[in-house]
Amino acid sequence: VWLSIGVLTELLVDDLPNVLDRAADLAALPFWFLGLYLFVVALAPPMIRLHRRWGWWLPVGMAVGVLAVDVVYYGLGVTEIGVLNYALVWLLAHQLGFFYADGSQLDLNRRIVAAAPVVGLAGLVALTTVGSYPVSMGGVPGDERWNTTPPSLALVVLTVWLVGLALLLRRRALGWAAACHEFLAGTNGVVLTVFLWHVSAVALAGGVLYPLGFPQPETGTAAWWALRQ
């Protein structure tokens, strides 16, 4: 829908208002995820075969590859190599799901499971404080460097932290899930649709509320946070 609107307005409107142009750009932002999702799913069959052959060595090797790309990209300034991390980082995150599916993650020693979120969080803090990686895991306008373009080692340690935390809380979470099974089944059925359209809703709301003089408190204030609850 937004792609059609964008094409039509470019063809039919000579002087496109900046607000409308910006709204169309923002509404299309979530589609980056859809493209990567289709890419990862398309490569699932060969990645499963590699998983069966190499096991844990595969994600470890991919993580080393991500680090090498970061060193060459940021250290040597060879920006062309950054495209490799679009595959390595997102495929690595997806690869960990195979270990959950075949039970490998569930067979891990309890100490390893407990250590994973600690190591992941410690690594993330180190990269974003001692290292030069941005604190934001997404992209913040004005920052010279983003962790998502290209994907960086920071996203890998973030994945280790979150996956480790999920495994650590798995038993309790399964109990919660059983208690609200119908709600989870219903929301999971529409979660991708909500994700793809949520920026459109924000853009439309902004287009209506801003001209009406809706208050815009300073970023970070209590009023600013209250309007986002």
Segments (PLM) and residue ranges:
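Alpha-helical transmembrane segments and their immediate juxtamembrane cytosolic regions
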Residues: 1-229
